[in-house]
């Protein structure tokens, strides 16, 4: 997998967290850099860990499904992409996914971790699909974590200004990227074996 593809996966996986961070920043009102870093560390760590967990699950099952693994990767990535697009279209401006104590500048880490975990389920599914490819999951997980960390900082800081306008659109763009990556994996496998 090319470095550009890995970066695109990292960006796509961080759009949910970006949308949640915009909501968090809007709820804080006037977030400080310290607030943004606090939220970004929690989201970044969880987004780094979940693809590794998914990859481990995929490795366990890989020898059972090796003949159609490219279809699984395509299905998971495309399904997640469609899900993200639908969520982005139906949220109607509700980007604040952190429903627990969003107005408290010093929110405890547990509600933030729960939100981060909820937005990282797709990263776990990516990890499962990557288990069927010849790729170093640590590199992909690190890129996903760094992209998430960076985008969450921007999301929190820009939350007050951007509000709902960017949040939903970021999720739609992330979904489109996942569909393209899934289609590319399927095309490459079919063209190499066909």
Swiss-Prot record:
Its membrane topology: Multi-pass membrane protein
Signal peptide (UniProt feature, chain positions): none
Keyword ATP-binding included in the entry's annotation: no
Subcellular localization, as worded in the UniProt entry: Cell inner membrane
Residue intervals passing through the bilayer: 3-23, 37-57, 65-85, 112-132, 139-159, 170-190
A cellular component annotation (GO) from this entry: plasma membrane
A matching Pfam family: Mntp
Name of the protein in question: Putative manganese efflux pump MntP
């Amino acid at each position: 997998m090319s470095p550009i593809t890995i970066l695109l996966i990292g960006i796509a996986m961080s759009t949910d967290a970006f949308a949640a961070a915009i909501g968090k920043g809007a709820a804080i009102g006037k977030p400080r850099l310290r607030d943004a870093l606090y939220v970004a560390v929690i989201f970044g760590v969880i987004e780094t860990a979940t693809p590794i967990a998914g990859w481990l699950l995929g490795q366990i099952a890989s020898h059972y499904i090796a003949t159609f693994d490219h279809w699984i990767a395509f299905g998971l990535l495309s399904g997640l992409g469609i899900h993200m697009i639908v969520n982005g279209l139906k949220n109607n401006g509700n980007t604040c996914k952190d429903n627990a104590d969003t107005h408290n500048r010093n929110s405890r880490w547990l509600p933030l971790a729960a939100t981060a975990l909820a937005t990282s389920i797709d990263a776990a599914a990516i990890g499962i699909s990557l288990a069927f490819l010849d790729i170093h999951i640590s590199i992909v997980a690190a890129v996903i974590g760094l992209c998430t960390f960076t985008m969450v900082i921007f999301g929190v800081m820009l939350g007050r200004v951007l509000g709902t306008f960017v949040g939903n659109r970021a999720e739609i763009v992330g979904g489109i990227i996942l569909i393209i990556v899934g289609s590319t994996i399927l095309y490459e496998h079919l063209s190499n074996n066909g």
